[in-house]
UniProtKB/Swiss-Prot annotation:
One term of GO molecular function: tryptophan synthase activity
Protein name: Tryptophan synthase beta chain
Family named by the database record: Belongs to the TrpB family.
EC number(s) recorded for this UniProt protein: 4.2.1.20
InterPro entries: Trp_synth_b_CS, Trp_synth_beta, Trp_synth_beta/beta-like, TrpB-like_PALP, TrpB-like_PALP_sf
Length: 402
């Protein structure tokens, strides 16, 4: 049966929907209508395709990581090089698409949330390109962790608002951005950075990010004589790079799909972001999805060395894939991710983002159980420039025995 999700009400099975206050429903309905129209408009897609090619630098290579493959000694590993996009990650695919959509809707201002800063940088970049006012909401903890990206956003003309509520991380930035959207609904478009939030956001983000999987599928077919890979893999926080990789393969039942979530200091601690391992369904940021919550239903703090993965929920479509068994989600600790970070740097000369390092770490485990005539495509969602100082300080502290 051909996969067709979401349904007319924005649900993926029981997950998703539009759990927003009445004050936001108008904006959500307006966005849904505008998106349906844009999808049917060939000139909209043509403008986006032109930007992706000539501004972002797509298509990104599908690179055969031979040294990594030899080191692990299992499946042939291919890297989908989203780190080579303009701004250094997959986030630009969605940011450009949504700014084009905002322009089409006649909006003058752009707001967005960011964790690691990559979505903030991508949104600020797209807003600069289209001469739009831009405010980025970022948790105070992430502002400290990602000072370089904060400066980048400001350099691009965006205002960065440091959020001091709650645990001062990504979920708090989303709350602040949603509040700002309610206040400026007439002239403002909110660019959700991950496959989260009320419908139609998860679908919009999925569709704009699906360029990752579409390209990878075609590129692999070209080098393999028309075959499909045996598996595809990506790291997962909210889940946008993963859904972009997975969605074009969802009807290809022979292709296994793996997501690497962050288990931080370990599943036996409270310092993790492993929603599938430890969460249960609840409503967060306008959608029903698996979330990390305590016995009283209060949303818990997520933790990861990677600022882009410490979100206490996972997008509704991933929740549906998990429930029906279409994708497998495993958790990777900070230590394992750091090993992946070092390994790819040493073996392939590619410094990955800490987010992507979780996928590299899971690839080691999965590829080792596969045979050399099988293949695994890993989404290398971003480059590690933003994380080098943090990793340097971590390694120095460990060397001093702190």
């Amino acid at each position: 049966m051909t996969y067709q999700q979401p349904d007319a009400k924005g649900f993926y099975g029981k997950f998703g929907g539009q759990f927003v206050p009445e004050t936001l429903m108008t904006a959500v309905i307006e966005l849904d209508k505008a998106y349906r129209e844009a999808k049917e408009d060939s000139s909209f897609q043509a403008e986006l395709d032109d930007l992706l090619k000539n501004y972002v630098g797509r298509e990104t290579p599908l690179y055969h990581a031979k040294r990594l493959t030899d080191y692990i000694g299992g499946a042939q590993i291919y890297l989908k090089r989203e780190d080579l996009n303009h701004t250094g990650a997959h986030k630009i695919n969605n940011a450009l698409g949504q700014v084009l959509l905002a322009k089409r809707m006649g909006k003058k201002k752009i707001i967005a949330e960011t964790g690691a800063g990559q979505h903030g940088v991508a949104t600020a970049t797209a807003a600069a390109l289209f001469d739009m006012d831009c405010t980025i909401y970022m948790g105070e903890e992430d502002v400290k962790r990602q000072a370089l990206n904060v400066f980048r956003m400001e350099l691009l003309g965006a205002k960065v608002f440091s959020v001091t509520d709650g645990s001062r991380v990504l979920k708090d930035a989303v709350n602040a951005a949603l509040r700002a959207w309610v206040a400026g609904i007439e002239d403002t478009h909110y660019i959700m950075g991950s496959a989260l939030g009320p419908a139609p956001f998860p679908e919009i983000v999925r569709d704009f990010q699906s360029v990752i999987g579409r390209e990878a599928k075609r590129q692999y077919a070209e080098i393999s004589g028309g075959k499909l890979p045996d598996a595809v893999m990506a790291c997962i926080g909210g889940g946008s790079n993963a859904i972009g990789m997975f969605y074009p393969f969802v009807n290809d039942k022979s292709v296994a799909m793996y997501g690497a979530e962050a288990s931080g200091l370990g599943l036996d601690t409270e310092k993790h972001a492993a929603t599938f391992a430890k969460g249960r369904p609840g409503i967060l940021h306008g959608a029903l999805m698996d979330v990390l919550q305590d016995a009283h239903g209060q949303i818990m703090e997520a933790f990861s060395i990677s600022a882009g993965l410490d979100y206490p929920g996972v997008g509704p479509e991933h929740c549906y894939f998990n429930e029906i068994g279409r994708a497998t989600y495993d958790s990777i600790t900070d230590e394992e991710a750091l090993e992946g970070f070092k390994l790819l740097s040493c073996l392939e000369g590619i410094i990955p983002a800490l987010e992507s390092s979780h996928a590299i770490a899971l690839a080691q485990k999965v590829a080792a159980k596969m045979s050399p005539d099988q293949s695994l495509i890993v989404c290398l969602s971003g480059r590690g420039d933003k994380d080098v100082m943090q990793v340097k300080e971590r390694f120095e502290a460990e060397a001093e025995g702190k």
